[in-house]
Structure formats: C-alpha cells, structure tokens
Amino acid sequence: MATFSLLPSGKWRAQVRKAGINRGATFATKREARDWATAIEAQANHIAAGGYAPVPKSVTVADLIDKYEQAASRPFGKTKAATMLMLKREIGKTKLANLNAVVLRDFVDRREAAGAGGVTIAADLSYLSAVLKWGRHARQLDLPERLALEVRASLVHRGLNTRSQERDREPTDQELDRIFAHWDGKARQKIPMETICRFALATGMRQGEITRLEVEDVDAAAKTVMIRDRKDPKNKYGNNQTVPLLPAAWAIVEPIIKEKGTGFLFPYEESSISASFTRACQALGIEDLRFHDLRHRAAAEFFRMGLGIPQVSLLTGHKTWSMLRRYTAIKPEDVHNAIKAA
C-alpha cells in the first residue's frame, strides 16, 4: 500500500510497499505523489499476478540501454560498445512503449542508406534484442523481447545477406617470404613482426590472444600457455584455456620467458601489429591478405600434420566443427596424401 507524508519543506513523500516492491519518492504536490504511487502500485499488481510491469511512458530506448550497460559486470568490447552508441543515436529518443516493427523498419532503412550491409544490420538487431531480453527478464518490464529478432529474420525479404562471407584466403610460402624480407630491411621496425607472425602460424591464436599472453601464463615444464578470456560465443569473460605450445611455438617462447621473467610476451598494441602487417602487404602489392589469415593458414597446417578435429579445436579454440571447417582449407590432394601415408 501507499503512504504519504508532508515534509517540513512543504513537499510530499510517497512510499509504496507492495508485492515485494519498496520504493519512495518526493514531489512538490500531494497530487503528483498520488499519481506516482498509483503507477507504482499498478506495476506491483502486474508482477503479483505473474505478469510483467508496464513500461513507464517516459522511458526511452536510450534509458534502457543505459541501464543495461550499468548492469554489465564488465565493460563491453569495442564492437558492442560502438553498436550501443549507434543504437542510442538512431532510436534512443524513441519511447520504449512505442518501439515496434515500424520503428525498426525505419531504422533498418536508415542503416541501409548509410551503407551498412546485411551482416552489420543483423548484428545491430541482435544487440538490440539482447537489451530487450534483459529488460524483460532482469527488470520484469512488459517488453516485446522477440521484436528485434523478428525484424532481423525479415532482412532476407529485403534481399540483404545476413551471413558473413567465409574467407578462404591464406598466405602462400612465397608471400610470407616476401613479407618477412620486407621487415628484415626495415631498420626502424620496432615491433618484431616476423616473430609475432611465426608465432601466430605456429599456434593459430587470434591477434588479441597473442598480445594478452604473459610470462606467468606459460608452464615451461608442460610447454603450455593459458589463454585468458578466450573468445567464446556465450562467455566473453572467464573462458580461460590452456593450450600446448608445439615445437615451433616453444622455440619462440622459451628465450622470451628466460629473458623477461615477467610481463607480456609480446607487449605491443593489437592495432599497431595489424597496421604494420597491412602496410607491408600494401608496399609489396600483396592483395586481400590480413593478419587474421595467418590463423587460417595455421589451422590448415594442423590438419595437414595429421591432427584430428579435437586436437585442432583445442589449439584454435573453435567449439564446433562447423566453426572450424571454414579454416581447414583441406584440398583434394591432401586427402590422397593422407591415404598414401596410411
């Protein structure tokens, strides 16, 4: 029930205790206090009846996103943080109670006109869906949690491709030789790019995983290293994984840990490594090659070495064969060679 108290300042204090809700607020007039208390009691009645609280008329999409961000246990990654800013910019002023398929249709129109592709727009809607789902289940608000997912599913009817194009590019031996020779001739090259690239080829690790490795994560006796917060579609944090360091990788790591004793194995900015790799490719006229393609080459080499799916998955961190398959690049002649070797 609601109680009202006249404060010495002349303002009115409303307090609502009902169905597990205990909230209070101060207002200039008793009428405002009563109106607020009535709305809060209505929410309590909805919750008590096993339903969800009605969305307050004044709450906007941006308000809900702000609450979602504040409730997060850790900071968002760069992509998610940028998407949340974009959502607040594009539809943030929309009243949450007015959010519907037409609003999202117009949002998609604007994104498409701005040059965003189907994959990007689908990701935008997936992030929005996560916010709506959180609002419904964490805040018990009567929100259409599947709204964004339904609009996402409709993108195909617009002719938008929502599946990212799978790359099958991997560097050739000749390309790698040219790139390494390019860095050898650079006296001002501060980042040991050849060493980092060879480590990527020997481990199949992502660029961010390489730059996060610390000496303390290495078990010299077991020749393993722990990758902290390894990428996982369900768990962004706490997904630590210990992986073996194969001979080529151990040959790189062993002198580093002996020399340093502590700290990062490769204390360089991820963006700087990527930029250096891109500049080298541009200078040499090597087209459509990215640092991440070294991971593709590594995964393919693991299979060519005769490792099975479980072993390669442990090295690369892929959870399923469907995720790993795009990196294999197994050729028909590889199958023939494997049979001959058997």
Identify the residue ranges that each predicted region occupies:
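N-terminal helical hairpins
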Residues: 26-58, 62, 70, 74-77, ...
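C-terminal catalytic core of tyrosine-transesterase DNA break-rejoin enzymes
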Residues: 198, 202-209, 279, 283, ...
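N-terminal core-binding DNA-recognition domain of tyrosine site-specific recombinases/integrases
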Residues: 23-28, 66-140, 165-168, 186-191, ...
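Catalytic-site neighborhood detector that most strongly recognizes the C-terminal catalytic loop/helix
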Residues: 170, 229-233, 250, 271, ...
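Conserved tyrosine-mediated DNA breakage-rejoining catalytic core shared by Y-recombinases
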Residues: 148-153, 175, 208, 212-255
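Active-site/catalytic core of tyrosine-dependent DNA strand-transfer enzymes
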Residues: 131, 174-176, 246-287
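Basic, Lys/Arg- and aromatic-enriched nucleic-acid-binding interface segment
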Residues: 118-126, 137, 141-207, 211, ...
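Short, Arg/Lys-rich segments that mark the N-terminal edge of DNA/RNA- and chromatin-recognition modules
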Residues: 1-28, 66-67
